[in-house]
Amino acid sequence: MVDVNRFKSMQITLASPSKVRSWSYGEVKKPETINYRTLKPEREGLFDEVIFGPTKDWECACGKYKRIRYKGIVCDRCGVEVTRAKVRRERMGHIELKAPVSHIWYFKGIPSRMGLTLDMSPRALEEVIYFAAYVVIDPKDTPLEPKSLLTEREYREKLQEYGHGSFVAKMGAEAIQDLLKRVDLAAEIAELKEELKSASGQKRIKAVRRLDVLDAFNKSGNKPEWMVLNILPVIPPDLRPMVQLDGGRFAASDLNDLYRRVINRNNRLARLLELNAPGIIVQNEKRMLQEAVDALIDNGRRGRPITGPGSRPLKSLSHMLKGKQGRFRQNLLGKRVDFSGRSVIAVGPTLKMYQCGVPREMAIELFKPFVMREIVAKEYAGNVKAAKRMVERGDERIWDILEEVIKEHPVLLNRAPTLHRLGIQAFEPVLIDGKALRLHPLVCEAYNADFDGDQMAIHVPLSEEAQAEARLLMLAAEHILNPKDGKPVVTPSQDMVLGNYYLTMEDAGREGEGMIFKDKDEAVMAYRNGYAHLHSRVGIAVDSMPNKPWKDNQRHKIMVTTVGKILFNDIMPEDLPYLQEPNNANLTEGTPDKYFLEPGQDIQEVIDRLDINVPFKKKNLGNIIAETFKRFRTTETSAFLDRLKDLGYYHSTLAGLTVGIADIPVIDNKAEIIDAAHHRVEEINKAFRRGLMTDDDRYVAVTTTWREAKEALEKRLIETQDPKNPIVMMMDSGARGNISNFSQLAGMRGLMAAPNGRIMELPILSNFREGLSVLEMFFSTHGARKGMTDTALKTADSGYLTRRLVDVAQDVIIREDDCGTDRGLLIRAITDGKEVTETLEERLQGRYTRKSVKHPETGEVLIGADQLITEDMARKIVDAGVEEVTIRSVFTCATRHGVCRHCYGINLATGDAVEVGEAVGTIAAQSIGEPGTQLTMRTFHTGGVASNTDITQGLPRIQEIFEARNPKGEAVITEVKGNVVEIEEDASTRTKKVYVQGKTGMGEYVIPFTARMKVEVGDEVNRGAALTEGSIQPKRLLEVRDTLSVETYLLAEVQKVYRSQGVEIGDKHVEVMVRQMLRKVRVMDPGDTDLLPGTLMDISDFTDANKDIVISGGIPATSRPVLMGITKASLETNSFLSAASFQETTRVLTDAAIRGKKDHLLGLKENVIIGKIIPAGTGMARYRNIEPQAMNEIEVIDHTEVSAEAVFTAEAE
């Protein structure tokens, strides 16, 4: 058996007849499966034990030899070898076909490989293969053309004309096989290369395609005639099993039926040939054999599929590989896991950040082997069997053992759908009663979990290594930051926010105002006994909190604060300043001086002078967590988060905030605002009736009026609201709801969208407190339904997008420390018109500089070349007035099959420099795919206004970008760099013409009349600049500009979509994806290389091919970059295993087999498929080939070893 972790690559080729015979353990001659009386396999049948091995371990068919001691003996009575029954999953048989049969993949696939090899059309091939026409194989001295087709009648006429034996013509796959044997690959290739020099158009395309296939045969050593089968392999019987059902009936795999048809027809053909039957009968039988083999290989590819009972098409070998239920996706990429369970989740507010509650009966089942081992070790039972019985009986002693066993043994919790890496995290189990898993409330956001009936799965890591990885890398307390943007993902929500908001409120004139306390305990005692209110402003001695970072002038003084804030600051990490105001200045620079009493000053006087501070909201808590993480990293942060959670829950309970209908305020001047709007609409309609405006203008004016009315109500609502109103507190604190929910409760619901996406002119004037009329209710139902269906569709679309993204980037891994490139990316803030989408500061954080950055005025070097830009450094650069910086970027990284650490920058999930081995491709795909469900689905209809600029937004736009499709509402771009000299309008053709004068000549662009112009006369434009509003077609931009311009454009476009929906994603994730779309080039002129024109290949392979030629003084090849959509890029990957498991399985495998492709197992998917440890993270060779050594001999890993690995994952393997 091959050790899966040792082999280096996997190759797939066409099987020659001798190869199939070498695999086979015997010929299957009969269509029988098993004897229905004895239930034993029939001899020479599809389940024969002589061919495929015994059905029971170490036992021959007749029972003469039983037990392992006869291992390897072949029984002299029944001929069965005594071995394991498992060989029935491995041993193959074969069928000797009495007539050659074509392989449907190679004849029917697009393009038809047989057709290209023989230069025949697929239709002609079909006629020959299915016995509708003769093909001339050897015309000898007759004027017939080789490969020309003759009908039955023409064939007879030609025979009479030229005499018998004067030429050779045949029909069926036999004829095709003869033709394929006659193909002289070398001569044909030379001829085609010659033809390419002069050919153009359709002829050239065909020549390139033929050359591609012939060259593949030539290089791989496959012979073209192997596309026709003379011998058919029979797959092992345990892969096409027969199982007995309860009623004594059998359920068999469809493959058995398909094989049975082939054997029946083959045997009948053999008999007919023996009997010398008439030619037409033999022909018919050969055609039926051909169809039977077609159905076995790919049922339904040609003609109507063969059906089983109930007219259900039978599943052929191809169907076994294809799709979600196929071999690749069902059994190889994901398997069911042992030691796992699932249950409903409930909240566990008392748990620590790294804990989860596991029900006892679940734990005893999951940890059974561990418990049994301990039972035997403690000598409660003599052997494992007895120990097992003890566990099953529920002996009292097992619970104490279980407690010991689970201590320090982390488990993994997973919630489907797992959209990003935070969907699986490790926790330490805590045994609980009941049947639901308990989950810490703060990790809910990462899982997107709530407690309305969600279920989660639990898995137990078994080996020591797996436990160590779970504990060190996956523990929930380590996952504070979100990998997509580096912001904390564990921010408190709902009750926790509300409690802390209530706690930090300030109020004037409450009981106890102006009291002064010596320390926290005294203040709490006063509050508990009713002398001081939580919100009243009091004084406290600064010296009672000696560990806080006070300024020197603040020590030994009295500080004005509230009792609530004393409690709030008590849970903060000691080195954080005392928080009085919810802003960044207080958090980073310390407590403001205005809160401190000067000696002899009256406290009431200071209190009266101070403004009342707003309480701490959800956003402020997020900032505090981020700052804590920045200063103290994970351990202290997770402990702080637990304290924050407990405090929030405690005080939201004490505050007792409830919501009743009386809490919804009534707006005093609602009637006035609505009457004014009615009046305005009436005026607009009057103007329209008089012909002063068009219908479109009227529609826009009416909808704008109602929108403004709604905004006026909203504004009034905010002005008149009571800050102590529970609904206002919920909204203001960020616990639940926003102003739009609030204004629907108290203001008006406003305009609704009609089923066609257009906004209806009639608004809903009522709010939910007043209640809606029947008509208003009816209007609003459409929006509600649309919301539901949109969500359902969006989830599926977003999931499929993630799958394609993961597929295209799964082999991008951090391979080395520094690629040493001299290229960089010039970045500035991303803008959309006047608005800034992403600031320069955000784009700089966590990246390495390519060149040093100087102060624009003083010329002082702010940061050197190749230095990491921290958050503070980025702020310093922006504050200095620098507008653009050249950084190291994934786009310009020179590492093969991955990225280097310097071009990538920091790992957003940890805030530290990225490690070699990090699977950044997968992280990038998840970061872009996970927020996909938050994006909108719709294309906005602006209601007939400027209708041709309906902009695609949200998820459809993201798909459009990543699939490199032509965008809707495409912008016209200029190919000339220069100045816009004239824009003329042509009323007759309803177009505008834009003239751009460049150095080399004038560019003239015709633009539709309705398009909105982006340029004016006199503007200077660069090549590839958009002249009109709209999206640029990236493929067109690639023709006009260079690769880097397209990459920069795509990056900016993706960011615009996400940022407009309020989703932040790190640039580097988009860079990784976009780079994968542009990694191929198309060879234009091969020069002196042996590349073929028109070939699509990796840039690195192309450079290698040219390097050798340039060294030897030849002419290098030229190429042009190609932009591929992510689906196409996934299918064009160098790994055929990865591509086949993605989509179009049969096409990928057909192509790979002809080329004799080798998969070097560089990506993650291909290693998962063959069951090898993945070459990322701790699976990388540099981390696995480590020998334990004495301390003094240890050296740092040499970087040469790393870059060698980057070229090929450890040749040592």
UniProtKB/Swiss-Prot annotation:
InterPro entries per the UniProt record, alphabetical: DNA-dir_RpoC_beta_prime (IPR045867), DNA-dir_RpoC_beta_prime_bact (IPR012754), RNA_pol_asu (IPR000722), RNA_pol_N (IPR006592), RNA_pol_Rpb1_1 (IPR007080), RNA_pol_Rpb1_3 (IPR007066), RNA_pol_Rpb1_3_sf (IPR042102), RNA_pol_Rpb1_4 (IPR007083)
Domain of life: Bacteria
Molecular function GO labels: DNA binding; DNA-directed RNA polymerase activity; magnesium ion binding; zinc ion binding
Positions annotated to bind Zn(2+) 1: 60, 62, 75, 78
Residues that, per the record, bind Mg(2+): 450, 452, 454
Record's GO cellular component terms: DNA-directed RNA polymerase complex
KW Magnesium (keyword) present: yes
Cofactor: binding comment: Binds 1 Mg(2+) ion per subunit. Binds 2 Zn(2+) ions per subunit.
Group of enzyme by EC: transferase
Keywords: DNA-directed RNA polymerase, Magnesium, Metal-binding, Nucleotidyltransferase, Transcription, Transferase, Zinc
Annotated Zn(2+) 2 binding sites: 819, 893, 900, 903
Catalytic activities: RNA(n) + a ribonucleoside 5'-triphosphate = RNA(n+1) + diphosphate
Keyword Iron among record annotations: no
Short name of any one Pfam family annotated for the protein: RNA_pol_Rpb1_1
Cofactor: Mg(2+); Zn(2+)
EC nos: 2.7.7.6
Gene Ontology BP terms: DNA-templated transcription
UniProt cross-references to SUPFAM superfamilies, sorted A to Z: beta and beta-prime subunits of DNA dependent RNA-polymerase (SSF64484)
Subunit structure: The RNAP catalytic core consists of 2 alpha, 1 beta, 1 beta' and 1 omega subunit. When a sigma factor is associated with the core the holoenzyme is formed, which can initiate transcription.
Family under the similarity heading: Belongs to the RNA polymerase beta' chain family.
Function of the protein: DNA-dependent RNA polymerase catalyzes the transcription of DNA into RNA using the four ribonucleoside triphosphates as substrates.
UniProt-recorded name of the protein: DNA-directed RNA polymerase subunit beta'
